[in-house]
Amino acid sequence: TGALDVLKNPDNRRYLTKAEEGQLRSEIAHAYFIFGVDAKAIREARHAIGVGKSDASLGYWAGGLAAWRSAQYDLAGQFFRSLVDLPGVSPGRRSAAAFWAHRVELRAGNAAKSIEYLTIAAQEIDSFYGAVAREALGQKVALSFDLPLMHGRFIAWLAARPGGQRMFGLLQIGNTHSA
């Protein structure tokens, strides 16, 4: 890819921290995964992790999914388990990684370990994988897509804020993205 060519150039890399390079390589690995180029996704994910360490969480994720899709289940498990244990990873991503680590362990016949990862995934109640994990564990899942009610005091408060009137005007003309 063009992005990878830019990163391969040492003159460009000298301006990046290791964390930034790891993040960029993680994005490239994810793009390779999205476009179904699993071998390159795995290779670039490994490179991202080697350079960016804990700043390459997307690399672990992309590498794990690409490895799973290409039937490299042990490798997928390494990526997902490492992501679960990664310091500073977002709760949603940890939940997702734990769910996929559960699938790897279940496929390998490790039921007890599978349940451990499923339990970790279920701890993030406000995520897709958390909801799926809770359902798989037999817990009641109450999903609601209702928007919270807005009280008149909130609307008055918002209107009094800098830019509040502009926001309401943009909403009235249907320009919700700019609002």
Region spans (language model):
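Extracytoplasmic and endomembrane cell-envelope/extracellular-matrix remodeling and assembly machinery
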Residues: 1-179
